[in-house]
Regions:
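Active-site metal-binding motif and surrounding structural segment of the metallo-beta-lactamase
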Residues: 41-60
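His/Asp/Glu-enriched, well-ordered alpha-helical/loop segment
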Residues: 220, 286-378
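Active-site core of metal-dependent hydrolases
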Residues: 187-296, 303-304
Length: 406
C-alpha cells in the first residue's frame, strides 16, 4: 500500500471532537492521519491520491484492551504448552488479538511459576510487532490455601510478604513499569483458577500504612500507580492511598463511586471476571459513566467466564480473551445508548479511554489529525452493533493493513 492515501466510508466514528462523519474520509501519510473531513472536501484537496473506498463498512479507531496477561499466564491457560513452546503460544495469542481488532494492549508482568519472563527481551520483541504493547510491572498474591506471592522482579520464585513491601524490590518494580496496571494486588487474586483451588482469594494483603507508602513511592518517582482490587474494604483502601487507576473495582458501592470521582480515579472494568467477586455488571458500568468517571473496559485475558451471569451469556467456561472484548462490552454499551449517550462517547470505553489508561491518548484511540492511523473497518459499531470478530473486516496499524478478511 502507498505511504499516502485516502480512505473513505459512508460512516466514520472518530471518538474525537469531530464526532461521527457521514460520507467522510481520512488522509493517511506515513502511518499518521494528516487530514480528516467530508469526502468531497478531502477529494478536492488531494486529487492525486489513491482512494480506498470502504463503502458501507464503518470506520472506527482500532480497539484497545488495556488489561491483559498474554505473555505470562495466558499461554499455559489456553494451550498445553511447555517452556519450549511458550513463545509460540504468545505469538498465537497476539495474532488472535489483532484478528479481534485490537492493536494496543496493556500487559501485566507479575512473575509466574509457569514461565520465567525476560522483560527486556519481550519489550524488544514487542517493538517488532504491528501493535502497541505497554507493560505494567507488578507484585501479585494468589489466593491458594497457602498464599503465593510473586513479583515481576523475582520471576518464578515465590516470596514472602516482606518482599512485597521491600523498598529495593519496589524501586525496581516502579522503574520498570510503563503504565499503572495491577502494580499492587490489594486482594489476593483467584487468577484464572477454579474457585475451590483458591479459597483465600479476596483476602486483604496490605495494611493501609503499607499501601500508602507504596503509592507514595510511585508518585515520588513521577509515576502513576494502579491496583487490583475488589470489595468495599479494599476499594476504600485504594482511594485512601491515592491510587490513580483501579482495575476491576468489583463490588463498588454508590458511595465509593462518588469518592472515586472526587479523587479523579480512572477505573478499568472487567465484566469477564478477575477477582473473588462477581464482575462489573452493565448497571455498574452505567452508574460509573453517569457519575463522570473515566472507565475503560478490558478483558483481563485469559479468564474462564461465569456462565451464570446474564450479561456474559457464554455457553461454556473455557478461557476467553480479546476476541470477546466487544461481547463483554455490549450490554453496558447498550445501556449507555438507552441513557442517551453519543456513540463516540460509548465507543471510547474500548478505544480512547484505554489509551488514557496506557498514557497513549495523544497517539492512539481516536481518529484526528496527528494520531496514528490505527483503525478498523467493520460491519457495524464495535461492541454496540457488532460483537462477532468476523464482522471486523480489516485492521490497520500505522496506516498498514495487518488483518484483511476481505
Amino acid at each position: 500500500m502507498d505511504n499516502k492515501y485516502i480512505v473513505k466510508s459512508s460512516k466514520i466514528i472518530t471518538v474525537s471532537d469531530i464526532k461521527t462523519l457521514y460520507n467522510g474520509a481520512i488522509v493517511v501519510s506515513d502511518g499518521i492521519i494528516i487530514d480528516i473531513g467530508k469526502y468531497d472536501e478531502i477529494e478536492s484537496k488531494y486529487k492525486d491520491l489513491k482512494v480506498i473506498d470502504f463503502k458501507d463498512l464503518v470506520i472506527t479507531p482500532s480497539l484497545i484492551d488495556c488489561h491483559t496477561h498474554l505473555f505470562e499466564y495466558a499461554p499455559s491457560t489456553v494451550y498445553p504448552v511447555t517452556e519450549k513452546t511458550y513463545e509460540i503460544a504468545q505469538d498465537a495469542l497476539i495474532l488472535n488479538g489483532l484478528m479481534s481488532g485490537v492493536t494496543a494492549f496493556g500487559e501485566q508482568v507479575c512473575g509466574s511459576p509457569m514461565y520465567e519472563m525476560n522483560l527486556d527481551k519481550i519489550k524488544e520483541k514487542a517493538k517488532t510487532l504491528p501493535l502497541d504493547i505497554v507493560f505494567s510491572t507488578n507484585s501479585i498474591t494468589i489466593g491458594f490455601e497457602n498464599l503465593v506471592n510473586l513479583t515481576s522482579v523475582t520471576g518464578k520464585s515465590s516470596v514472602d510478604k516482606s518482599t512485597l513491601i521491600n523498598e529495593e524490590i519496589l524501586e525496581k518494580i516502579i522503574d520498570e513499569s510503563e503504565y499503572p496496571g495491577e502494580n499492587v494486588f490489594i486482594n489476593a487474586t483467584p487468577a484464572n483458577l477454579k474457585e475451590e483451588l483458591v479459597p483465600k482469594a479476596g483476602e486483604i494483603i496490605y495494611t493501609q500504612e503499607e499501601l500508602n507508602k507504596i503509592s507514595k513511592m510511585f508518585h515520588n518517582k513521577g509515576k502513576k500507580i494502579g491496583c487490583h482490587v475488589a470489595g468495599e474494604e479494599g476499594i476504600k483502601m485504594a482511594i485512601e492511598a491515592k491510587i490513580d487507576i483501579i482495575h476491576h473495582g468489583h463490588g463498588i458501592t454508590n458511595e465509593l463511586i462518588k469518592k472515586a470521582k472526587e479523587e479523579n480515579i480512572i477505573i478499568v472494568v472487567t465484566p469477564l471476571g478477575g477477582t473473588h467477586l462477581k464482575p462489573n455488571s452493565p448497571e455498574e458500568i452505567e452508574a460509573l459513566v453517569k457519575e463522570g468517571i473515566i472507565i475503560a473496559i478490558a478483558t483481563d485475558s485469559y479468564l474462564p467466564p461465569d456462565i451464570n451471569l446474564p450479561w456474559l451469556n457464554f455457553e461454556d467456561d473455557s478461557p476467553k480473551g480479546p476476541e470477546v472484548l466487544m461481547k463483554i462490552s455490549n450490554q453496558g454499551m447498550l445501556k449507555l445508548k438507552d441513557a442517551g449517550l453519543d456513540e463516540n462517547e460509548i465507543l471510547s470505553l474500548i478505544t480512547l479511554n484505554g489509551a488514557k489508561v496506557l498514557g497513549l491518548e495523544e497517539k492512539i484511540g481516536s481518529l484526528k489529525v496527528g494520531m496514528k492511523a490505527n483503525f478498523i473497518a467493520s460491519k457495524g459499531v464495535p461492541g454496540l452493533e457488532i460483537t462477532d470478530t468476523n464482522d471486523i473486516i480489516k485492521v490497520f496499524y500505522e496506516g498498514k493493513c495487518v488483518i484483511d478478511k476481505k
